[in-house]
Amino acid sequence: MLYFIFCQNLSSSSSMSNSILFLSLFLFLPFVVDSLYFNFTSFRQGDPGDIFYHGDATPDEDGTVNFNNAEQTSQVGWITYSKKVPIWSHKTGKASDFSTSFSFKIDARNLSADGHGICFFLAPMGAQLPAYSVGGFLNLFTRKNNYSSSFPLVHVEFDTFNNPGWDPNDVGSHVGINNNSLVSSNYTSWNASSHSQDICHAKISYDSVTKNLSVTWAYELTATSDPKESSSLSYIIDLAKVLPSDVMFGFIAAAGTNTEEHRLLSWELSSSLDSDKADSRIGLVIGISASGFVFLTFMVITTVVVWSRKQRKKKERDIENMISINKDLEREAGPRKFSYKDLVSATNRFSSHRKLGEGGFGAVYEGNLKEINTMVAVKKLSGDSRQGKNEFLNEVKIISKLRHRNLVQLIGWCNEKNEFLLIYELVPNGSLNSHLFGKRPNLLSWDIRYKIGLGLASALLYLHEEWDQCVLHRDIKASNIMLDSEFNVKLGDFGLARLMNHELGSHTTGLAGTFGYMAPEYVMKGSASKESDIYSFGIVLLEIVTGRKSLERTQEDNSDTESDDEKSLVEKVWELYGKQELITSCVDDKLGEDFDKKEAECLLVLGLWCAHPDKNSRPSIKQGIQVMNFESPLPDLPLKRPVAMYYISTTTSSSSPSVNSNGVSVTFSGIEYGR
């Protein structure tokens, strides 16, 4: 839950590394200063006392800090980090660089008259805030001090209410940077009401060289559509002249006569003081003895020699790995090995005119393999691809064993010159994504759409239930669903797929997939299951019927109120389900009246059932097929979309967070194999 780091980790895997590190520490020890890092991903009762809660602020059951009760007025709450944070050095007089990232949410319940907002502040350690100076004073100021603080103070405010006495008169709600005053030193317009209840991710950074204090922010769902509204702000200020060397960091939020709820979801901070580099090194050179210089030279030469040997061994291992991969693949039945030369010829040297699409893993090209007289799609993985050697080998091993009419057929592979290529059958009608959201002239008729839904369900039934092992696809989305000449489904891209025994419930894999299609429990815990694949299947069904993307971050009509386009597709469809407006408001407008209402209702309700926030409430793929064939009735879903709660278990670490080989792998777009 909390990561807290001081620069004291001096361990190494070899004696030589230890020697070099010890020498470096010896040389630069006089100039080492405090360095601090922490990361709160949630806030809970009973946590170590690293956060102090004041006023009405309390840690809530959902892991957030609730600064005030939304049902009461004139409340103020604040939190502070319990330890002092050094922001400039008494020895050098120089300020530190620091960066803090946090996420928060404001529920502006009274859109016509908001509360007063939330702010991040820096103040002297132990400074006593005025007792309950609520409302626009944010518990930081009092009227008797002429809108100034009784102690040095710098704060960044997300102000939801315009106070005529001190707030700018040319904008309403705003983001401001304030220097010891309620009057913002610099500010920019910010429409608080249009972002109500959306999660905001903000970052505040200070550059000690340029003296620039900058703020950036972005929202998860609602985009900034007002041209007068910015998403960044900066102000030049020398913190070493304004604040003491040690300060406390914190957040404060207030509501006046209007109710407004403020929540802090996460908080991360890193701070380090720079050394006095130029003068230090001059003194250092003078102070080093001749023997120390010789020793350092020897260590550098030795390090270069060892590094060269390691590079040579790495190259030898790469060659051995390539040979090993080839042997593994050659043992697999079905797909055959092609030479790189043949693929270069088939794709006209991977000509841009042959390119069918490009994604995070690389590019896909149309090719003509004269050797087998077949048109193919050649998937060429890029050198810095997220889909590296392991995923390449994984995709070949899994898909080479699968045989089903609704799966893309893998014809062959190539692993030469450190290049990884997969050769698939060319699917002439491209991806479902290109038909629903692209610029193809021909509209998908309703019969074809329903056929696509059944075909995808058939492919998923084979993967989950009918093959020897359960195959978790983990990346079911419209751009991975190919359509042949008769618009039969061909599910492809098995680079993220995983095998597991049928009796197992889930498989912890690390996060991978595409936002908008990933189940909430999978995003939160990284645990893939049949149910997480079913969730993705449900999203695709909703896209098929509505002709809308799973996530659309646009806003219509420039209105101050939240529009439908600011919601995810699941939220919108479920809301219309509750209003009993599925058929009248959800079906793709391009279809007009040319669709089967019973089938449309079937796919929409089934899509919501599959995309239920609670994984235990989703159907199996067998149940889904029975519903699509009208062998089972439609489920009776809640009129309002349920909210599932997930507890994230975190541990304390003594080093900076890192991502291992099973880390995050997410994409925002796919590729289409075909035209």
From Swiss-Prot:
Disruption phenotype: Increased susceptibility to the oomycetes Phytophthora brassicae and Phytophthora capsici associated with reduced expression of some defense genes (e.g. PR1, PDF1.2, CYP71B15 and CYP81F2). However, normal defense responses to the fungal pathogen Alternaria brassicicola and to the bacterial pathogen Pseudomonas syringae. Susceptibility to P.brassicae and P.capsici is enhanced in plants impaired in LECRK91 and LECRK92. Residues 36-269 are annotated as: Legume-lectin like. One of its GO terms (biological process) is protein phosphorylation. Residues 1-35 form the signal peptide. ATP binds at residues 356-364, 379. It comes from the Eukaryota. It is found in: Cell membrane. In the C-terminal section; belongs to the protein kinase superfamily. Ser/Thr protein kinase family. This is L-type lectin-domain containing receptor kinase IX.2. It comes from Arabidopsis thaliana. The gene is LECRK92.
